[in-house]
Amino acid sequence: MQYQAPGAAPAAALGVGVPLYAPTPLLQPAHPTPFYIEDILGRGPAAAPAPHSLPAPPPPTLPSPNSSFTSLVAPYRTPVYEPTPIHPAFSHHLAATYGTGAYAGPLYSFPRAVGDYTHALIRQDPLGKPLLWSPFIQRPLHKRKGGQVRFSNEQTIELEKKFETQKYLSPPERKRLAKLLQLSERQVKTWFQNRRAKWRRLKQENPQATKKEEAEGTGDHGDPRSEGSPSPAGGGEAEPQDSPSAASQEDPESDVSDDSDQEVDIEGDKGFYSATR
C-alpha cells in the first residue's frame, strides 16, 4: 500500500499540475530522505508551518528527486530573465508612465525596452539638431532660385549714380565700372539695359517729371544718344555697342524686365533679369 502524504492536498488545491516526468534538479539537498514528509514538502526541522491562505499561487518549481509531487523549495528556483537596471535619468519618467496603467498588460512586461529605445535616440542625436534637414537648411544666401544674384546696396548706389549722369556706357567705361564694383561686364550691361527699360516706362507714365530730370541731368552732358559715336573727322567705322539701336538689336527682351533692377540672371544667354510686370 502506498502512503499518501498529507501535503499533497494543498498542492492539488493550488491548481499545480502533476507532471508525468520529473526531471532531476541541478542542486541536491544536503541529506536526501525521500520517505519523510518534511523532505517531500521541503520543510526543514525549524521551518515555520505553511500558511493556510496564500495571496497568489506560486510559480511551478522543480520537483523532488524521487517523488511526483511538486516542491515548494525556493533555492531550486532559477530566474529565467533578470532585467537590467534602468538609468536614473529615465527612472522617474518610466515610473510615471507605467504607474498610470497606460501600458498595462503582458505585452509590456519589460519596461526597460522603452527606456532603451529612448536612450538610443538620444545617443543618436546628442546635440538636438535635425540631421536629415541640415543639407537643406544651409543654403547660400547670396544666390537665388534660377541662378539669380542680388546686388549689394553699395553696388546699387554706384550704379544709380552713374545712370543719373549717363544712360549709356561705352565698352571702356563699362569695363572700368565693372572693375570698380567687382562685377562682370555682362552684369553691368544687363543692369543698365533693365534700368533704361524702367526709365522708359516711367517716362511714359509721367512725362513731365521725366522732362524736368532730363533738363537738370543732361544739360551738361548733352544728348546721351550721341555717347560713343565716332567723330566725322576720325572716320572710324566702329559702331558703339551701347547705343539705343545696338541695345535694341542685341537685347530685344530688355524692355520686358522693367522692375527687376537688382536681380541678374547670370545663367541666361543674354544675361537679363527675370522681371514681373
UniProtKB/Swiss-Prot annotation:
Biased composition (Basic and acidic residues): 210-226
PANTHER family: HEMATOPOIETICALLY-EXPRESSED HOMEOBOX PROTEIN HHEX, HOMEOBOX PROTEIN HHEX
Distribution of this protein across tissues and organs: In all hematopoietic tissues except peripheral blood erythrocytes and in the liver and lung.
Function comment: Recognizes the DNA sequence 5'-ATTAA-3'. Transcriptional repressor. May play a role in hematopoietic differentiation.
SMART domains the UniProt entry points to: HOX
Subcellular localization, as worded in the UniProt entry: Nucleus
Span list, region Disordered: 47-69, 199-277
One GO location term (cellular component): nucleus
Gene source species: Gallus gallus
Record's protein name: Hematopoietically-expressed homeobox protein HHEX
DNA-binding region: 144-203
Bias kind Acidic residues: ranges: 250-266
Pfam families linked to this entry: Homeodomain (PF00046)
